[in-house]
Amino acid sequence: MGNILTCCINSHCGWPRGKDAPCYESDTDIYETVAAATSESTTVEPGKLDVGATEGQDLQHISNQKMPTGPPEDRLSLKFLPSSEEDNDDAKILPSPVQGSSEDNLSLVCLPRSEDDDCDDDDDDDAQILPSRVQGGCYRFDSSSCSSEDNLSLVCLPRSEDDDCDDDDDDAQILPSPVQACSEDSLFLRCSLRHKDEEEEDDDDIHITARIESDLTLESLSDEEIHPG
């Protein structure tokens, strides 16, 4: 605690007789004496707090420390290590050397099903990601490899006899078609002939012919033309 003033300059305060009180020239001397004594008694040692410290005095308990920082060029990525049968999946943080290239595009390629595989609906076909030559999202077709007469057609392949996969769709393959349209051939749509026992409410059969030289014409055939005699 701070020092206590044990002297008084007032003669009416009841100071004990026989003891001489120190004399002060003014009130300012009293305040300076008390302040000097208080400042000496309120010195705080490191780690200790003085309850009698005066207001407005700053105390430092913890010095400022900087946190350690790593080099900014390090970049970390999460990489999973193969797990053993007993241990759980472990993870290790390693620098990532993977860099994406603007020229490389990936495509999904399905691997052929082996002959001894069972045709289960729950099992999906294995897939492998390989580099693709597709550029700009479109397949580049080389027209120089085929002649102008060749036309492409969709051909369904026959189902094998030992195939047990009823849920699988028929495979399809695009092959060159030898069919060539000639300008002299006329296209026509022929309706099936009406039987005699059919109702008379049905419209007459229709025959459509198309030629290069003329427009499309719609011809209605009468019963006499269909069944002569």
UniProtKB/Swiss-Prot annotation:
This is Aspartate-rich protein 1. Residues 84-106 are annotated as: Disordered. InterPro entries: DRICH1-like. It comes from Homo sapiens.
